[in-house]
Regions:
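Active-site proximal loop and beta-alpha junction motif in alpha/beta enzyme cores
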Residues: 3-91, 97-308
């Protein structure tokens, strides 16, 4: 996507105002989880404007809601577009949950459906007295891809011999976006991760393994968690990756780490001091993993307005 010229954005004869809300997703407390900016009415914004605003917000993702006729929204869902600072995404987990939370607003709706570039994604909310609101999205049916050779992945990531858990497979799975799940031996291994992102990205490109590895270990900080996870990328680390967590959920149920329909906790973001709690579950039907659900809490931290 070409970079918009400054004058295209700034030199507008009429000043326009676009409210936004900033949320922390997969946390019940501010300043934890994964941050998200939501523009609840993006009508009138071009693709270039949306990309420029995502860069301005400088978060892992920013979403733009495009309201339309209520009858269409009831049938197809509320139209939402997701942008990183560099590009538009067809799907991402924490933007889906956070945007649905923002749309729910004061109505208290139990169900919110979004129409993303990947298709319709339903989100259901649960409320209990004295507890923060909990939202759970249903992701796309899992597609199981390549099971990778351990030694090849060690070379592609610059891991050490013996870092990978030999009892579980390294596998590419997609529930909307593909990720390659890499099981590691323990917390000591996952905490000292220093991945060669150039080599690993090239390997994933060649094997159609998605854009990122999702590193997990069954040794956890919270004894109630089932997995401890990290997701590294160029320029940093993701504190909570809902799309990858969906892939890991399908992987857990397929390989016996979690039982069908058992809701389990994935902890992520601890190494970057943004602890996140991602609750996941999936079903089995005719020996296939189906109905992958990813949920958590959301908290509002900022309200503001962008003018140009």
């Amino acid at each position: 996507m070409s970079r918009p010229h400054y004058n295209e954005i700034a030199m507008n004869p009429e000043l326009r105002r676009f409210p936004f809300v900033q949320l922390d997703v997969f946390s019940s407390r501010p300043f934890e989880g994964n941050s998200l900016a939501v523009f609840p009415d993006g009508r009138g914004l071009s693709d270039q404007h949306m990309q420029a605003l995502a860069r301005e917000m400088n978060l892992s993702e920013t979403t733009f809601v495009l309201p339309r006729d209520p009858s269409i929204e009831r049938e197809r869902g509320v139209r939402v577009r997701i942008f990183t600072v560099k590009e538009e995404l067809p799907f991402a987990g924490h933007p889906t949950l956070g945007t649905a939370f923002a749309l729910r607003g004061s109505t208290g709706a139990a169900d919110v459906a979004l129409e993303l570039n990947v298709g319709r994604v339903p989100v259901r909310f649960e409320e209990s007295a004295g507890q923060p609101v909990f939202g759970e999205m249903t992701q796309a049916e899992p597609r199981f891809g390549l099971i990778h050779d351990r030694e090849t992945v060690v070379r592609a990531t610059s891991l050490r011999d013996g870092d990978i858990d030999p009892s579980l497979p390294i596998q590419t799975i997609s529930t909307g976006l593909p990720f390659t799940i890499v099981p590691l031996r323990g917390l000591d291994v996952i905490r000292r991760l220093q991945v060669d992102l150039v080599k690993s990205s090239e390997y994933l490109r060649q094997t159609e393994g998605g854009t990122s590895f999702y590193f997990v270990t069954r040794e956890t900080v919270d004894r109630n968690a089932r997995l401890h996870a990290r997701m590294l990328f160029y320029g940093g680390e993701d504190p909570a990756t809902g799309s990858a967590a969906g892939c890991a959920t399908a992987w857990m149920v397929a390989h016996g780490v979690a039982k069908p329909d058992e809701r389990v906790l994935i902890e992520q973001g601890l190494e970057m001091l943004r602890p996140s709690r991602i609750f996941v579950r999936a079903s089995r039907l005719d020996n296939k993993v189906v109905n992958v659900r990813v949920g958590g809490n959301v908290v509002e931290v900022v309200r503001g307005e962008v003018s140009f």
